[in-house]
A protein has these predicted regions:
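N-terminal, charged low-complexity regulatory/assembly segments
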Residues: 1-65
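Hydrophobic, Leu/Ile/Phe/Ala-enriched alpha-helical segments that form helix-helix packing faces
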Residues: 14, 65, 118, 165-168, ...
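Secondary-structure boundary/capping signal
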Residues: 22, 73, 176-177
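Charge-rich, low-complexity amphipathic helices
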Residues: 36, 83-87, 96-104, 167-171, ...
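Amphipathic interaction/junction segments at domain boundaries or subunit interfaces
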Residues: 53, 63-153, 157
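C-terminal non-catalytic interaction appendages of large macromolecular assemblies
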Residues: 134-139, 144-148, 152-200
Length: 200
C-alpha cells in the first residue's frame, strides 16, 4: 500500500532536519497514530477514508513536530505537505478538464462525488442549494476534518485542509468558476461551496 503523503512528508522532514531525534519522532508519530486509530475504530469505511488519508496523520505529525519546533512552524510544515499534494491534484484535474467538452460535466461530477464520498456516512452534512444546470452549490454544515481537529485540540490545523480545496479547484478551466467565502475550519457557520459553468 502506498505510504500516506503526510507520513511521507513527516519522515522526510525529521530525517533531513532532525536526524538525531528522527527515531524518537517517528516512534512518537506512529504511537499517536495508533492511538488515534483505536479511538476511531468504530468509524464507517467512508469516514475512515478521510481519517486515514489526511486527518489522523495530520494530527499525529503536527503534535510530534511541536517537540522540535515552534507551534506556528509545525503548522506551516503540515500546511506545506497538504499544499504540495493539492498542487499535484490540481495539475491532474486541469488536464482532465482540458479535454474537449469535459468541463461541462464537472459540476455534475461534483454533485455525485459529494453525495458518495462526502455524505453523512463519512461524517459530513450538506445542504444542497443548487445541483443542476451546470451548477454545484452546497453549504457544508458538518465536516469530520473540523470536528476531529477541534476534538484533538488543534482547530488551527483544519484550515490546512480548507486551503487545499481552494488550491485544487480554483481555475480548473477558463469556463469554470470556483467560489467559496466561508469555511467551518475558519470559524464560519458552513463551507459555502460553489463550482459552476461561467455565464457567456
Amino acid at each position: 500500500m502506498k505510504e500516506n503523503y503526510v507520513a511521507a512528508g513527516f519522515k522526510k522532514t525529521v530525517s533531513e532536519r532532525f536526524p538525531a531525534e528522527a527515531d524518537a519522532l517517528n516512534a512518537m508519530f506512529n504511537a499517536r497514530l495508533e492511538e488515534l486509530r483505536a479511538q476511531n475504530a468504530g468509524a464507517s469505511p467512508e469516514k475512515l477514508r478521510h481519517l486515514e488519508g489526511q486527518i489522523m496523520p495530520g494530527v499525529a505529525a503536527y503534535e510530534a513536530l511541536q517537540n522540535v519546533m515552534p507551534k506556528d512552524e509545525a503548522l506551516k510544515t503540515i500546511h506545506d505537505y497538504v499544499e504540495e499534494r493539492a498542487w499535484k491534484l490540481k495539475g491532474i484535474f486541469q488536464k482532465i478538464a482540458g479535454f474537449p467538452g469535459v468541463y461541462r460535466l464537472i459540476p455534475g461530477l461534483f454533485v455525485k462525488g459529494t453525495r458518495k464520498m462526502f455524505g453523512e456516512s463519512a461524517g459530513f452534512a450538506a445542504k444542497e442549494i443548487q445541483t443542476g444546470k451546470g451548477v454545484w452549490r452546497i453549504d457544508m454544515v458538518k465536516c469530520p476534518y473540523h470536528d476531529a481537529c477541534v476534538r484533538y485540540g488543534c482547530p488551527e490545523l483544519c484550515p490546512c485542509f480548507c486551503d487545499s480545496d481552494d488550491i485544487t479547484y480554483d481555475e480548473l478551466h477558463p469556463k469554470l468558476a470556483w467560489h467559496r467565502t466561508k469555511t467551518l475550519g475558519r470559524g464560519d457557520d458552513c463551507c459555502d461551496f460553489c463550482l459552476k459553468i461561467k455565464a457567456k
